Every structure is written in C-alpha cells, then in structure tokens.
C-alpha cells in the first residue's frame, strides 16, 4: 500500500497513538515511614494519610534536561530507532531552569550526529497539563497534512520538590517518553474529549529563583475534584450521545461499569482513592432511580439530594462514597498506583506513570476488549489496543517492579541534606555538582558542570564510566535498522520492498511491529475488534470512544 505523504487529502494515518513507552525515575529514594519519624509527625501521616510508601528524589547531578535526555535515549535504544526516523519532539514540563531556552533544544544534541535537525515541536508548560497537551499535539501532527511519515516522540518530565514541611512528602521525580505514530497498540480515540479550564491560585511558581511552588493545599484538592466532576459529566454526555447514534448501542446511562480500569493523575495515592468515590457520587446523582436498599448504593439514600458543588469539603459524603467504592478502587485503580506509591508525584508524567504501572502488572488478556478511564489533571486521553501488539508493549514494561527494587535507600537525614544542598546550588553559575555520578543507574545522563555563563554540560555514565555525546551517538542504528521500516521509501513515496519487509522482522524488546505501510483511515467511526482496549480519559480534557465488536 502507498505510504502517507504530506498534504494527502485522500488518506490519513490509522490508529494513531502510543507505540512504545519508556519510564525513568531516580536511583535513590527515602522511606515515607522513616521520614515520618524524622519529621516528628504521627505514625501513618504520610503512609496511611497520603497513601505513600516511598519517595524518589534526584541527586545533585540530575536536572530536568538530564532526566529527559536519559528517557529519550533509552526509548530510542530499546526500540532500535534511528534518529532520523523522528520528525517531531514535544516536551511537557513545569520544571523550568531557563526562561528562554527549551528542554527540547538540549534534546536535539542527541540528533546531532544523525544530521537530523528537521524535528518539529517545542516545550509546553502549564503545571501538570503539559505532558498531555504535548501528546495531543504530537497525535494531531501525525493526523495532519503536515505529517511526513515519521514518528513523533513525546517527553513528560519533572522534578517535584517542596520546602520543608507538610508538602515535602508529596514530592517525586521522573520522566516518561512515548513514541507516537500510526497502527499503535494504544490508540488515541476520536470523538470523546471533554475540557475544563479555569483560573485559580491553588498551585503556582512565581519565584523563578526557587524550585519550590506556592501551594494552597485545600484549594488545590477542591480544584482537582471539581475538574474531575465537570470532565466526567462532559465525557458521559458525549459517550451517551455516541451510543444513541450507534446501530447497536447499549441503552442506559454511561457509568463506572463501562470502565474496566481507572487511572488518575496522582499527587498522592489517597486523593486517587477519594476520586474513585467522587465518580461514584456522580453516577449516583445522575442515576434515575438508584437502588439504595442493596447493592452498590446501599445506605446512600440520605445523599440523594446533595449538590456536587456543596460537597467538596463534606467529610460525611467523602467517607460514605469512598467506602461504597472500595471494591471498585481495588479492582479498577489500585494496580495502577505502583509507581506513584513508591516514587511519588512526577507532575507531568504522573498519569502516564499510572498507565505504565497498569501495563506492567496486567496481561494483554486482562486489557483486551475493555475500556480504561484516565484522568489527567489538566487533560486526558483515550486508547485501545489489539492484544498482539499490546503484548509487546507490556513486555517492555515488565521490569518496572524490579527497577524500583534496585534503587538505593537513603536515610531521611541524608535526604534532607541533599535537599538543602540542592536549594543552595539551584541556578548557581560556575558550579560542579557535589557527589559522585556513579550512584546513578547505568546509562543515565547527568549534569557535569555549569560554567560561568550558566551553560550546562552533560555526560552519560555507563557502569560508572563517563561517555561524552560524540561517543554515544556514533552507534545509533541506521534507518534500515530501525523499527521505522516505513521510512525506506522511493521518490514516489512508495515503501520499498526492503522497507516493507523490515516492518515485521525487526528484533527488540517489543518484538516485531505491525505493518505500517497501510495508513488509510476513514474518519467515520469504525467497528473495533473484540480484543481491543479502550482507554477513555477524564481531566481538564477528556477523550474516549465506544467499544463494540467487529461487524
């Protein structure tokens, strides 16, 4: 089949979404229970109260650039990509170390030896929304007339640190890179996306000389839950509208029963558990005649007349619906909290860390034929996956629990000292980071030095040995060795026979890739295969699609 060319009005790529997903988190952590004792707070305040077990944090040698360099390099290496197979690179982050120079420009150093500077995209910054906005931008590019047949890469990365006090245990750090293109195992659905935006001073960073945010905790939680309410309402309305237009629609309101799994942006795990209860409250109030004498809504009759806007601070409502939704939480959400509970809040990558955690612990059979709801505070996405290519994506994340176990535990007093030193050296010129980079994971990029003009120099360690840019990039696979066999095209845009053959034969951690030489897509809603997963997202933006069997 002909490959899609820019400006083609006859076809657009089919099943655009996430082809591969790579996760990076720091190599050291602090135990939350030990941090409770060190901070002199009551036992369980961080562990039971917040639902957090451990918190990852960055060493002095790591910054937002090094995190993103590491995760992009790892995505390319494990996927056997060539650097010239990437035509767009988007970065979502709120960790700003330069008011003008984007993180994306630093990442372009990885492309240098390939000669590929024709890479669109830039940084997107708006608290935790930037990652999902970047994903939508990348997908829109692939689906647009500007697409030139290459992949897009989306990077979400942040370092979440707080001043000493109650907020510090809700920190974390990490980065996630996603490969975006056609025929993906996780597909961004068309037709279901709801958005909620508003102005609020709940969380912001007005002091550019500090990494620490200004936070109004109670207001921030209220904003989070209000966004969840409004986006779920928009999502439900659009989903029900699609049902009515479908030929074989399932009658009745859209409810949590329509999701097999639910994943959320996770500032701390306890808020996610409350959010599941919040969604159940929405279903309860929207139900025409809920049965309160038994079943899911048993005993909830006293709350039948409440208004959502009056319940954000009601502990009675929160407790009742959290208890009623406990089994839903255990089945649909708890498996996704592995990374959040053990590494903490990563900001822009947070919800994608939950997606990675879910994929790392579920089989393709668990996910096939189901819908996954995803709430990203600030936005959302939807996806589906055929069971075969989904297997390959799952296998690439199978080592996530082992990687968490391989980290180094740091005593709370040492953690506090590292945070103090980080505060003192933040944005310091003519500076060499304290300590050794050899404690980082092998293959991690690190900050080597900041010169007197604030220019940052990076290197990559491999088993403790420093590797400069030039040595690292000479071994990059050629286009013919990458998984992007579709890029082996003749001048007419037809995929060459050799290029087509590569598509199903390339080795790698994800195994052979599906055929990408056919990219024709009808924009009308199509029947889906019974063994496909739908991931519908809820947030300040929401996307999803009805799942139905093949005609």
Label for each model-derived stretch:
Residues 24, 92-98, 125-130, 155-161, ...:
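Acidic, glycine-rich active-site loops and adjacent beta-strand->loop/helix elements
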Residues 490, 515, 521, 529-531, ...:
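Intrinsic-disorder-associated, low-complexity terminal segments enriched in Asp/Asn/His/Tyr and depleted
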Residues 1-61, 167-248, 288-297, 381, ...:
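Condensing-enzyme catalytic core mediating Claisen C-C bond formation in acyl metabolism
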Residues 356-400:
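Catalytic phosphate/nucleotide-handling subdomain of diverse soluble enzymes
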Residues 221-230, 237, 241, 257, ...:
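A conserved active-site cap/scaffold subdomain adjacent to cofactor or substrate pockets
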Residues 71-87, 231-258, 277-282, 358-366:
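Phosphate/pyrophosphate-binding loops at sites that engage ATP/ADP/AMP, CoA/4′-phosphopantetheine
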């Amino acid at each position: 089949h002909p490959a899609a060319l820019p400006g083609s009005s006859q076809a657009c790529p089919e099943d655009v979404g996430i082809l591969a997903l790579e996760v990076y988190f720091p190599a050291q952590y602090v135990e939350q229970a030990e941090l409770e004792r060190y901070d002199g707070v009551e036992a369980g305040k961080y562990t039971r109260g917040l639902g957090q077990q451990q918190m990852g944090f960055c060493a002095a040698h790591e910054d937002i650039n090094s995190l993103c360099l590491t995760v992009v390099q790892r995505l390319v290496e494990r996927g056997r990509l060539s650097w010239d197979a990437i035509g767009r690179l988007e970065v979502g982050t709120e960790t700003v170390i330069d008011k003008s120079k984007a993180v994306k420009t630093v990442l372009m150093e990885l492309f240098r030896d390939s000669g590929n500077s024709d890479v669109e995209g830039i940084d997107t910054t708006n608290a935790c929304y930037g990652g999902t906005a970047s994903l939508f931008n990348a997908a829109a590019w692939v689906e647009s007339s500007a697409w030139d047949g290459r992949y897009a890469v989306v990077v979400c990365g942040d370092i979440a640190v707080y001043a000493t006090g109650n907020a510090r245990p809700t920190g974390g750090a990490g980065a996630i890179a996603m490969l975006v293109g056609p025929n993906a195992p996780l597909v961004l659905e068309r037709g279901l996306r709801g958005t909620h935006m508003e102005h609020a001073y709940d969380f912001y960073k007005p002091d550019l000389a500090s990494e620490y945010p200004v936070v109004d905790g109670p207001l921030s939680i209220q904003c989070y839950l209000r966004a969840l309410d409004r986006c779920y309402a928009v999502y439900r309305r659009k989903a029900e509208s699609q049902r009515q237009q479908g030929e074989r629609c399932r009658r009745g309101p859209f409810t949590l029963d329509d999701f097999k799994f639910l994943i959320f942006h996770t500032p701390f795990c306890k808020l996610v558990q409350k959010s599941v209860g919040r969604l159940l409250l929405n279903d309860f109030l929207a139900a025409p005649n809920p049965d309160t004498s038994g079943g899911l809504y048993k005993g909830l009759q006293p709350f039948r007349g409440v208004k959502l806007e009056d319940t954000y601070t009601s502990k009675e409502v929160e407790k009742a619906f959290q208890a009623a939704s406990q089994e839903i939480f255990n089945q649909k959400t708890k498996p996704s909290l592995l990374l959040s509970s053990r590494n903490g809040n990563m900001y822009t990558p947070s919800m994608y860390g939950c997606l990675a955690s879910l994929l790392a612990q579920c089989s393709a059979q668990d996910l096939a034929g189901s819908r996954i709801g995803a709430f990203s505070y600030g936005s959302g996405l939807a996806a589906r996956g055929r069971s075969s290519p989904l297997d390959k994506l799952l296998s690439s994340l199978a080592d996530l629990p082992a990687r968490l176990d391989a980290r180094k535990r740091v005593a709370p007093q040492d953690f506090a000292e590292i945070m103090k030193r980080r505060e003192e050296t933040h944005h310091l010129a003519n500076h060499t980071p304290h300590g050794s980079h050899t404690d980082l994971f092998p293959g991690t990029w690190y900050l080597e030095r900041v010169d007197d003009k604030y220019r940052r120099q990076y290197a990559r360690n491999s088993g403790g040995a420093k590797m400069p840019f030039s040595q690292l990039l000479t071994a990059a696979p050629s286009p013919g060795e990458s998984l992007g066999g579709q890029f082996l095209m003749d001048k007419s845009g037809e995929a060459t026979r050799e290029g087509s053959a590569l598509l199903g034969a390339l080795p790698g951690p994800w195994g052979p890739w599906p055929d990408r030489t056919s990219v024709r897509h009808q924009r009308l809603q199509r029947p889906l295969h019974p063994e496909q997963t739908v991931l519908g997202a809820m947030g300040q933006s929401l996307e999803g699609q009805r799942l139905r069997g093949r005609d």
